[in-house]
């Protein structure tokens, strides 16, 4: 199995070698998420309502993903840093601790989610009609919580060992399965929105099975569940994993919080149709962020490994490459969103009323999206170099202290209606992104 040489390869070569397979994997993953929504939106008679119902489930799905990344993205940089130092036993212990915590947390989230799914969805803004579609979708989705968390949380450990192609394959397996199963279950078996959920959990289970098989049988460092007697010895590892992973965890939880707040305000001001508008806007954002995520995650192990190996020049060069790649890509993506929004919206729905409302919302929401690049770069660097405090602070700043208050302030205090909800995002991009990037530059000057 081909492995990236972190010691002797060039910085640009290593980043591209890690990022390109991940980009392919993420595009396929995006496709199966997006295709899910495209098919759901085209269910006869109830498509728009069903699409909004799936949007109501997003916060719960994001919370599950956040816990996956708490242990996966928290453990993988520490794993890479210790590999860079040559401390292989420590690296292996970190991976096994992450895996064990993922499994335990997955079971707990599944049980809690199933017990409280209905009141949670109502709290998130579900109407009586919306709940009739969101509840069955969510209950089925929750069955696959553990496989979903293993597939998402353990894949970074495949990439961290330099097996970028295998990391890509793990995502590809689930994506292809979902692309095949979605139309079969939704339309062929006439299961509607329930069919979409069933297709998703089968696909996630296939991905998880491959990830576990590879890390158990093929990878250089092998994964296993910690024995009862090992937990005490790995307590410090668990604390460090959670501490570093808290930044990404908080960032995703705050994304979920923002979605909840937006849905709540939009439902009260604009009705269920604006829940569907927000679902489409969020879907476009997911499309745009996919290559950015691949570049970030492809760069992260290179940053961590060279930081652990005490090669500051390579660390700085990797940051420069990361920044340039993301800025160039985002400039192109932003131009498409601003000048051809109808094309992107049309991917998800042909509803004329929805299209008219979405165009303005999309342009407002993405007005200053280029400034988000600064946040992406800063957060990736903080996480990769084990700078926990900065990573956590900037995860909270943009969403909790800027977006959430403005989401309520603009529509109600300034009487801006639904426009105010979408305007909160670009303002937070400018303030949060700029402060995060400046802090990263100061940190690099002082400590590297």
Where in the sequence are the language-model features?
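Small-residue-rich hydrophobic transmembrane alpha-helices
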Residues: 51-111, 148-167, 263, 275-335, ...
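Helix-terminus/linker motif at the lipid-water interface of multi-pass membrane proteins
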Residues: 27, 31-51, 121-128, 184-191, ...
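Short alpha-helical transmembrane segments in multi-pass integral membrane proteins
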Residues: 1-19, 79-144, 190-245, 303-368, ...
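N-terminal transmembrane alpha-helices
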Residues: 6-46, 59-74, 78, 103-110, ...
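Transmembrane helical elements of multi-pass membrane transporters/channels
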Residues: 17-36, 140, 174, 203-207, ...
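Short runs within selected transmembrane alpha-helices of multi-pass transporters and secretion channels
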Residues: 69-72, 141-159, 167-178, 196-211, ...
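Generic alpha-helical transmembrane segments of integral inner-membrane proteins
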Residues: 23, 27, 31, 35, ...
């Amino acid at each position: 199995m081909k492995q990236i040489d972190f010691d002797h390869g060039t910085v640009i070569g290593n980043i591209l070698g890690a990022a390109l397979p991940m980009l392919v994997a993420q595009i396929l993953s995006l496709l199966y998420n997006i295709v899910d929504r495209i098919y759901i939106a085209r269910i006869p008679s109830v498509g728009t309502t069903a699409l909004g119902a799936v949007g109501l489930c997003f916060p719960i799905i994001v919370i599950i993903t956040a816990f996956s990344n708490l242990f996966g993205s928290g453990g993988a940089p520490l794993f890479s840093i210790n590999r860079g130092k040559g401390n292989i036993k420590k690296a292996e212990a970190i991976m096994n601790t992450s895996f064990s915590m993922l499994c335990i947390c997955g079971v707990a989230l599944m049980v809690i989610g199933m017990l409280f799914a209905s009141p949670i969805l109502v709290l998130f803004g579900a109407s009586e009609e919306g709940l009739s579609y969101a509840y069955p979708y969510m209950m089925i989705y929750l069955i696959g919580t553990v496989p979903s968390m293993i597939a998402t949380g353990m894949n970074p450990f495949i990439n961290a060992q330099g097996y970028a192609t295998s990391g890509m394959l793990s995502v590809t397996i689930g994506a292809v399965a979902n692309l095949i199963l979605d139309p079969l279950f939704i339309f062929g078996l006439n299961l509607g929105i329930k069919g979409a959920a069933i297709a998703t959990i089968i696909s996630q289970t296939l991905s998880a099975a491959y990830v576990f098989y590879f890390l158990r049988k093929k990878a250089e460092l092998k994964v296993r569940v910690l024995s009862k007697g090992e937990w005490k010895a790995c307590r410090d590892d668990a604390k460090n994993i959670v501490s570093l992973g808290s930044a990404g965890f908080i960032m995703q939880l705050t994304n979920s919080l923002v979605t909840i707040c937006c849905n709540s305000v939009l439902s009260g001001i604009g009705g269920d149709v604006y829940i569907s508008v927000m679902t489409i806007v969020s879907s476009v954002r997911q499309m745009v962020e996919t290559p950015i995520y691949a570049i970030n995650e492809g760069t992260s192990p290179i940053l961590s490994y060279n930081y652990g190996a005490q090669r500051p020049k390579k660390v700085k060069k990797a940051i420069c490459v990361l920044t340039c790649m993301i800025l160039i890509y985002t400039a192109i993506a932003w131009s498409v969103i601003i000048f051809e929004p109808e094309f992107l919206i049309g991917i998800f729905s042909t509803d004329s009323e929805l299209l008219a409302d979405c165009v303005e919302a999309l342009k407002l929401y993405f007005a200053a999206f280029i400034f988000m690049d600064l946040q992406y770069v800063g957060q990736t660097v903080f996480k990769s170099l084990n700078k926990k405090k900065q990573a956590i602070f900037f995860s909270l700043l943009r969403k909790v202290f800027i977006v959430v208050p403005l989401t309520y302030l603009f529509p109600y205090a300034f009487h801006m209606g639904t426009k105010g909800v979408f305007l909160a995002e670009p303002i937070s991009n400018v303030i949060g992104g700029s402060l995060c990037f400046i802090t990263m530059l100061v940190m690099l000057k002082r400590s590297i």
